[in-house]
């Protein structure tokens, strides 16, 4: 089917009843709460506060509804209530600090009666122990340095005595050593004749 063939839907809206007077229509309109009025009423509405003249004119039924507190709505505390809460909190904190200070003093007094040293004496003893530990560590470092220096001086000495260079070889010894080196490969590989250079063929 083509869209042109579709029938137009006509809505029949009933006309308002003409029997009501215009004054009654205005009163009905005033009684109906608008969205703005509903928002104002739900915004921090407290039953103690007096209703505004606009709310009074809106009708008795609506006025009764506004007096009922909404359990789901959040009502922030007033400034006086916040000040009271803050004062009580500060007082509780100060009381706790005083109680802790008095308890610490009582514990210190009991410890002193039992013979425990004071905190100042304990701190002095700890400082003395730290100084002794530092002195011991410095002495150990000096010993290590001295030992390393002694090792450096003795590193040139052998097991029996100081290390010395061997005397230089004579020419004959050098020649003998070279001959030994030449003969070594023949001795090292027995059963194998040493390779000798093949004689060059005559006429080439």
UniProtKB/Swiss-Prot annotation:
Membrane spanning stretches: none
GO terms under cellular component: cytoplasm; cytosol; neuronal cell body; nucleus
Processing and modification events after translation: Dopamine- and cyclic AMP-regulated neuronal phosphoprotein.
Ranges of biased composition (kind: Basic and acidic residues): 41-63, 109-118
Record localization: Cytoplasm
GO molecular function: cAMP-dependent protein kinase inhibitor activity; protein kinase inhibitor activity; protein phosphatase inhibitor activity; protein phosphatase regulator activity
Biological process terms in GO annotation: behavioral response to cocaine; cellular response to cocaine; DNA-templated transcription; intracellular signal transduction; locomotory behavior; negative regulation of female receptivity; response to amphetamine; response to morphine
Keyword Acetylation annotated: yes
Predominant location category: cytoplasm
N-acetylmethionine modified-residue sites: 1
Cytoplasm among keywords: yes
Phosphothreonine PTM sites in chain numbering: 34, 75
Region feature Disordered, mapped onto this chain: 1-204
Biased composition (Polar residues): 89-100
Modified residues (Phosphoserine): 45-46, 102, 137, 198
Keywords associated with the record: Acetylation, Cytoplasm, Phosphoprotein, Protein phosphatase inhibitor
Ranges of Acidic residues composition bias in the record: 119-138, 170-183
Record family assignment: Belongs to the protein phosphatase inhibitor 1 family.
Function: Inhibitor of protein-phosphatase 1.
Full protein name: Protein phosphatase 1 regulatory subunit 1B
Lineage, highest ranks first: Eukaryota, Metazoa, Chordata, Craniata, Vertebrata
